[in-house]
Amino acid sequence: MLYSQMSKEQLQAEKTALEKQYADFKAKGLKLDMSRGKPAPEQLNLSLDMLLHCLDGDYKSSNGIDCRNYGVLDGIPEAKALFQEMLGVSADEVIVGGNSSLQMMYDTIIRALQLGVLGSEKPWCRYDHVKFLCPAPGYDRHFAICQALGIEMITVDYKEDGPDMDTIEKLVSEDEEIKGIWCVPMYSNPTGITYSDEVVKRFANLKPRAKDFRIFWDNAYCVHHLSENHDHLLNIIEECKKAGNPNMVFEFTSTSKISFPGGGLAVVAASKENIDFIKSHANIVEKAAEAE
């Protein structure tokens, strides 16, 4: 039975049982690995068959690429199709990367600092200050990227349906040095908030003073539902298109909490124009790797 369906008495009984279970665990004096976000061995075992038999027989992707060899810049069709379904985007709106979406976020900001983004008048590093809006509580690794790169962080409070959009709309419309915002739009830690439809639409309709402002949409938990009765999140890329701001968002996710965290896939999704811009620079690195 779902907790939401339990009576007060049933919830109290469940609480008492869990507290006893917790006390029993404490009494054992265990030394446990409580690393945040690390799947248990039982969860990893669920993916073993996929790993053990992935190279049985045919090694080629649907477009004839030998998957034992060098891949392709934006991912094989099967990998792109997986993320197309997860995020509701088209094949030309995704780049499949390594196993870390956080690495792709870092690379995206580094590229913006050094080269700018699509439509930039100059690289972000040419401004006296670069600022990011940081809804809090948020993900400490997002904030660590800003801290490491000297990006000023501006805290934005949360409401029950997402970040304080009145504050966000005001700040981005007034300050050209605000170049981005971090967002965890679904099941955001530690509150579990999923952005409401209104919040997503207001993000898509932002009118930032900085023409190269970007929303960093870390949709890490887009398919991580606990029950059939789960939250739903509007498609930010589609909403940005409707609002006339198709290039304003970078969306990220990965399979880290789905299969093997160290051996999964990560992705950046964005408008075709944004993706083409990223590929035009990433292509240099790929050609260098193939030449080694």
Which residue ranges define each predicted feature?
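Residue-level detector of conserved, well-ordered beta-strand and adjacent loop positions
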Residues: 35, 157, 253
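Walker B catalytic acidic pair
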Residues: 218-219
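N-terminal "arm"/small-domain region of PLP-dependent enzymes with the aminotransferase-like
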Residues: 2-74, 78, 84-85
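Conserved core of the PLP fold type I
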Residues: 59, 65-211, 222-244
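Short aromatic-enriched loop/helix-cap "lid" or pocket-rim segments at secondary-structure transitions
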Residues: 43-48, 226-230, 262-264
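Conserved core segment of the aminotransferase class I/II
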Residues: 97, 238-292
